[in-house]
Amino acid sequence: MNAVTEGRKVLLEIADLKVHFEIKDGKQWFWQPPKTLKAVDGVTLRLYEGETLGVVGESGCGKSTFARAIIGLVKATDGHVAWLGKELLGMKPDEWRAVRSDIQMIFQDPLASLNPRMTIGEIIAEPLRTYHPKMSRQEVRERVKAMMLKVGLLPNLINRYPHEFSGGQCQRIGIARALILEPKLIICDEPVSALDVSIQAQVVNLLQQLQREMGLSLIFIAHDLAVVKHISDRVLVMYLGHAVELGTYDEVYHNPLHPYTRALMSAVPIPDPDLEKNKTIQLLEGELPSPINPPSGCVFRTRCPIAGPECAKTRPVLEGSFRHSVSCLKVDPL
């Protein structure tokens, strides 16, 4: 346990989560079995009340699919996802309805996630009208205005349309829509990657402020390692659908154990120009393997500088302590 999670209850428990897609191309005969794309392949973790979990990894590693599988937007192939002790996988649509008021999502492209034919007042109010149909129009409007103020939008903009706002403002609208039901968990799927750097900082600071005020837990997915370090309590590193390292942000950033994590962290820019000039970047050789035909054993072994013969035979699993665990046969997690 760390200071953030000590004494707090487990909100989300994920065990051996897998998301596989069947792929059949035009070169296959109809009687041939389809190929399998392993987008997420056996991720296990716990998320605690009030915690922010950062998820990092290169494009195509399964970050977004992992997040969408949690909330049921993508169907999981196998594994377990429990919310407050209740199994989510296999739930019926009417059962999901109650859970989704507790778990909301903020999407990557702020403008594309908003209906262009609806005013922002209607967009933010839509979850309220869905879950509280008996709420009066006046009460809905007042709650929408209060939420707009909370995310930094002026209430007099309530009747405007999404195209009249900047990217940062559209993301604030998306945040307001996600928070209007007062959920316990927000899944942020690369919420700042489409924004300018200055706007990114504003959105991240807003999320942290709202987390303190509302007692939220966050799953924050991003490419920008500096942003993830700034906002996260713990960090999950993914590679080709696998969890390769998990730990507190301090351990993962300052004492990375997995060769892939070391390469990632070596690419983070250092503000001091003298240190930046003299640092060594660990370059990975070879191409990223296909998730349709991943390597046997450790999926990172084809690009790993310390891989041995045993890495082709045995698939490693996360081992270590709560503060720091790693999935590597060549590294001692303790």
Swiss-Prot record:
GO terms for biological process: oligopeptide import across plasma membrane; peptidoglycan-associated peptide transport; protein transport; tripeptide import across plasma membrane. ATP binds at G57, E58, S59, G60, C61, G62, K63, S64. It catalyses: a [peptide](out) + ATP + H2O = a [peptide](in) + ADP + phosphate + H(+); L-alanyl-gamma-D-glutamyl-meso-2,6-diaminopimelate(out) + ATP + H2O = L-alanyl-gamma-D-glutamyl-meso-2,6-diaminopimelate(in) + ADP + phosphate + H(+). It is found in: Cell inner membrane. It is a peripheral membrane protein. Keywords: ATP-binding, Cell inner membrane, Cell membrane, Membrane, Nucleotide-binding, Peptide transport, Protein transport, Translocase, Transport. It is an enzyme of class 7 (translocase). Residues 12-265 form the ABC transporter domain. Disulfide bonds: none annotated. GO terms for cellular component: ATP-binding cassette (ABC) transporter complex, substrate-binding subunit-containing; membrane; plasma membrane. PROSITE patterns: ABC_TRANSPORTER_1, ABC_TRANSPORTER_2. One of its GO terms (molecular function) is peptidoglycan peptide transmembrane transporter activity. The keyword Cytoplasm does not apply. SMART domains: AAA. Belongs to the ABC transporter superfamily. The complex is composed of two ATP-binding proteins (OppD and OppF), two transmembrane proteins (OppB and OppC) and a solute-binding protein (OppA or MppA). PANTHER family: D,D-DIPEPTIDE TRANSPORT ATP-BINDING PROTEIN DDPF-RELATED, TRANSPORT ATP-BINDING PROTEIN. This is Oligopeptide transport ATP-binding protein OppF. It comes from Escherichia coli (strain K12).
